[in-house]
Amino acid sequence: MISVNEMGSYVIEEMLDWSEDLKTEVTKLNSGATIIDCGVKAEGGYEAGMYLARLCLGDLADLKYSTFDLNGIKWPAIQVATDNPLIACMASQYAGWRISVGDYFGMGSGPARALGLKPKELYEEIGYEDDFEVAVLVMESDKLPDEKVVEYIAKHCGVEPENVMIAVAPTASIAGSVQISARVVETGIHKFESIGFDINCIKSGYGIAPIAPVVGNDVQCMGSTNDCVIYCGETNYTVRFEGELAELEDFVKKVPSTTSNDFGKPFYQTFKAANFDFFKVDAGMFAPARVTVNDLKSTKTISSGGLYPEILLESFGIRNV
């Protein structure tokens, strides 16, 4: 079986070799753990973001920069294509590990989750578990992890601290924006899973999403980065669905973000109105704007949702001068 941590370790080695070009900073802690700063104190940028996205996906997707038409503005975007959608997106990329140690907090994603089984139920559902001596993690945080954080991660992953490798970028950074937009395919799969769809029938995935500019602090950027997927994220999935076509159509109708009661305005406004309490925001909003599914069994293709660039432009706060 594919080891996402082994695949990720090769990407880390590339990042170490090209650190100066990527504008990242590498730190070796006393424990021997490797920390790669992609935007906390280091400058980082688009290429660092591309490497972060590769890490998150266990290097099991083809990633390319592209452009997206936002009402006449050619905007940077990222394309994602994978023939291993469950392992790449759910076993690796999904940000399913909230790491809180002392005053440190970050969202953990990437290969190391498959060692710690974060969360266990998901790995049982897709039938995947990794076994590798190195733990590779991507942290979305505005702080660099210290020895206590490394020790916590090593313990949960069953590896030695010296074999922990962490790449870090805050939400409010170009690298952070890139890796979040690269979650467009994963976001759709997660929404499918949340409405009771058997995600094991998904054979491949493709998606494209614009990349948010840095619009403010981490909370404000959390709004704009999510909006890239919510309002202009577009995904295509190839599935082999064993049920009736009408049942598949019903699932596809429920996936796009347009089905959410909170749809229609920049996410930061919704989040602020909810007193910045995620539990008061409709989870159904976290989905691509448009979803298309090609079913290999029926050979039919179904599409639902739409793109809303005007809301994304509002979220970005672009001023024409």
Swiss-Prot record:
EC number, UniProt record: 3.5.4.27
The answer on whether this UniProt entry bears the keyword Methyltransferase reads no
Pathway(s): One-carbon metabolism; methanogenesis from CO(2); 5,10-methenyl-5,6,7,8-tetrahydromethanopterin from CO(2): step 3/3
Q: Which GO terms describe its molecular function?
A: methenyltetrahydromethanopterin cyclohydrolase activity
Q: Where are the coiled-coil regions?
A: none
Q: Which GO terms describe its biological process?
A: methanogenesis, from carbon dioxide; one-carbon metabolic process
Q: Which UniProt keywords apply?
A: Cytoplasm, Hydrolase, Methanogenesis, One-carbon metabolism
- GO CC aspect terms: cytoplasm
CDD domains, per database record:
MCH
Reactions listed under catalytic activity: 5,10-methenyl-5,6,7,8-tetrahydromethanopterin + H2O = N(5)-formyl-5,6,7,8-tetrahydromethanopterin + H(+)
Keyword Ligase present in the record's keywords: the answer is no
Q: So which domain of life are we looking at? A: Archaea
Q: What InterPro entries does this protein map onto?
A: METHMP_CycHdrlase
Q: Which Pfam families match?
A: MCH
Q: What does this protein do?
A: Catalyzes the reversible interconversion of 5-formyl-H(4)MPT to methenyl-H(4)MPT(+).
Would you tell me the protein name for this molecule? Methenyltetrahydromethanopterin cyclohydrolase
Which gene underlies this protein? mch
